[in-house]
């Protein structure tokens, strides 16, 4: 009886181990950690231009002025753990200085922000191993749509959350609304990763694979925020070594860790589809054997 149970358990866990082995093989072949380092470097160069472009778009729409402030606090509170206040002051100072630039300098900011989009596009298509290239005009349209519509959608989602928060004080659904607001960052991360894995690759991505990969990435991202904040709080070695400059390596490490999570979610999405194809091919070979 015990042997039968062990055989069944081994039979059920065998596909999981095979999939994990395939996932590890792809991570190694794609040099995921090196790719994450490249994206982190480009992200740090593009951070101020990207933020400047985003808040310039909000400034162009007066109805989003209040939402712009909420979005700013939401980003620094939920995407830059532990040191968000310090980084926020520096970035806002840099953005304020960038507003004094000429038209040529503003165009340079936009180009730098688009460079980040291009790097993300290239990295994800390298993971999907897609050799099909989009037309340049189409790629530019996609990048510009992300730059313009992305912040506006985020602002709209924050407006909805503010509306729910106002309902909290005027209804008997306090518990439900509290739970929705508590998981709101996770839902926003999940939707963002799902859109990233579905739209950016130049080949068709099965929707269920993108949903699973995005959910794992969102969970890791939320857990990573809490773990990273706990590490910075409990083991303040960076502050002891770097002093007032500690915010710089902390930002570097966090951006690198974030890109590792994003690329891992992409690898999971790809591996789900690849493993399914390999399994179907193996079953087909067994059926063809006499």
UniProtKB/Swiss-Prot annotation:
Q: Where's it found, cell-wise?
A: Cell inner membrane
One Pfam family recorded for the sequence: Virul_fac_BrkB
> What cellular-component terms does GO give this entry?
plasma membrane
Going by the entry's taxonomy, the superkingdom of the source organism is recorded as Bacteria
Would I find Disulfide bond among this entry's keywords? no
Q: Which residues span the membrane?
A: 44-64, 104-124, 140-160, 183-203, 210-230, 244-264
Give the membrane topology.
Multi-pass membrane protein
Please tell me where this protein is predominantly located: membrane
Identify the keywords attached in UniProt to this record, alphabetized: Cell inner membrane, Cell membrane, Membrane, Transmembrane, Transmembrane helix
HAMAP family in the record, alphabetically?
Answer: UPF0761
Q: Which family does it belong to?
A: Belongs to the UPF0761 family.
Identification of the protein by name: UPF0761 membrane protein YihY
- UniProt gene name: yihY
């Amino acid at each position: 009886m015990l042997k039968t149970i062990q055989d069944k358990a081994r039979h059920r866990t065998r596909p999981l181990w095979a999939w994990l082995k395939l996932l590890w093989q792809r991570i190694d072949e794609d040099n995921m950690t090196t790719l994450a380092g490249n994206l982190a470097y480009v992200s740090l160069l593009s951070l101020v231009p990207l933020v400047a472009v985003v808040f310039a778009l909000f400034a162009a729409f007066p109805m989003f002025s209040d939402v712009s402030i909420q979005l700013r606090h939401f980003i620094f509170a939920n995407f830059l753990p532990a040191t968000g206040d310090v980084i926020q002051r520096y970035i806002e100072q840099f953005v304020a200085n960038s507003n004094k630039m000429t038209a040529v300098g503003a165009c340079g900011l936009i180009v730098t922000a688009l460079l980040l989009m291009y790097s993300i596009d290239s990295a994800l298509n390298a993971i999907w191993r897609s050799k099909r290239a989009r037309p340049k005009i189409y790629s530019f349209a996609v990048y510009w749509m992300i730059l313009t519509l992305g912040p506006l959608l985020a602002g709209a989602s924050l407006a909805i959350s503010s509306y729910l928060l106002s309902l909290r004080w005027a209804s008997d659904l306090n518990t439900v609304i509290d739970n929705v607001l508590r998981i709101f960052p996770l839902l926003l991360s999940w939707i963002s990763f799902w859109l990233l894995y579905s739209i950016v690759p130049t080949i068709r991505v099965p929707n269920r694979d993108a949903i699973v990969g995005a959910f794992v990435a969102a969970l890791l991202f939320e857990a990573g925020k809490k773990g990273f904040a706990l590490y910075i709080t409990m083991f303040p070695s960076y502050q002891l070594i770097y002093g007032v400059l500690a915010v710089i390596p902390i930002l570097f490490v966090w951006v690198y860790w974030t890109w590792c999570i994003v690329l891992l979610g992409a690898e999971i999405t790809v591996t789900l589809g690849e493993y399914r194809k390999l399994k179907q091919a193996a079953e087909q070979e067994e059926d063809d054997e006499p």
